[in-house]
Amino acid sequence: MNQHYGRHGRGRGRDFAACAPPKKKGRNHIPERWKDYLPVGQRMPGTRFIAFKVPLQKKFEAKLMPEECFSPLDLFNKIQEQNEELGLIIDLTYTQRYYKVEDLPETISYIKIFTVGHQIPDNDTIFQFKCAVKEFLKKNKNNDKLIGVHCTHGLNRTGYLICRYLIDVEGMRPDDAIELFNSCRGHCIERQNYIENLQKRHVRKNRNVSAPRTDGLEDSADPTEQVYTNNKPVKKKPRKNRRGGHLAPSQHFQHQTQSSPYSLRKWSQNQSVYQRGLVPPPGPAGEDYSQRRFFWSARPNKWTAESYQRPFYPYYWEWNL
């Protein structure tokens, strides 16, 4: 008799068990290593930045100890304990399962920039981040509200883009920017490719690049305008290099591309009133895109406008990419 018959019945039961497919994680599973990081860092002196890990909505709390919970409400409480006020959240995660925009107070601006983990953010992602920060600072120069940035752990993607901004725009030395971020976050940037890129990459002046860069922005609306949309999930595999969401403008736009024609209706100028319309294509496949307050696109040759008075933009960008 085959030795496997006696213990496992007919067939090689032990071998079959070894080949069984891994159990799929549910949508409510806690991000890997999420518990290992401090929820919120400290404000970075001389800047408006504060970094934190992604807050998790209530449905995740069943899998956490009470002291491990970190919800959007906990985020604001912890920042208030530092006698600071949050004005903008830049979400760099490549999913929307962790919390909903409705979990945030209406007074908080929110921008989603889909950013793939582990790899160096591309120029489009960096450009979107810089634009979002500069626009917020311009509109909030008379207050001291903070820009909160998070990825999953609030460390690698978050640290890279904050440091990239400080190096390229503020002129900070790479090592100083990295040290400042690490000390304020309470954890050090872990990914060596991020650190090496920050240390070695030359700062580039964006002179004479108005055509490829401003074409993507001159018809776009305020990146911090509060907008709800009605996106529904689409079960399609995302493009390999897809980055960022799409900004819903405050005027009527017609936008068509070869892959995804859509239109955007005119939004109310009253930020407390939201209208629903057809919406841009979603981000990563299999996620819920029904709750989104801001959409951002800084890609060239994407927006075309009808009956829209374009805002002023300089002929070339003086700040760095």
UniProtKB/Swiss-Prot annotation:
PROSITE patterns: TYR_PHOSPHATASE_1, TYR_PHOSPHATASE_2, TYR_PHOSPHATASE_DUAL. Residues 1-11, 233-245 have a biased composition (Basic residues). SUPFAM superfamilies: (Phosphotyrosine protein) phosphatases II (SSF52799). Residues 1-27, 205-262 are annotated as: Disordered. Its EC number is 3.1.3.-. Substrate binds at residues 152-157. It comes from the Eukaryota. Belongs to the protein-tyrosine phosphatase family. Non-receptor class dual specificity subfamily. Possesses RNA 5'-triphosphatase and diphosphatase activities, but displays a poor protein-tyrosine phosphatase activity. In addition, has phosphatase activity with ATP, ADP and O-methylfluorescein phosphate (in vitro). Binds to RNA. May participate in nuclear mRNA metabolism. This is RNA/RNP complex-1-interacting phosphatase. It comes from Mus musculus.
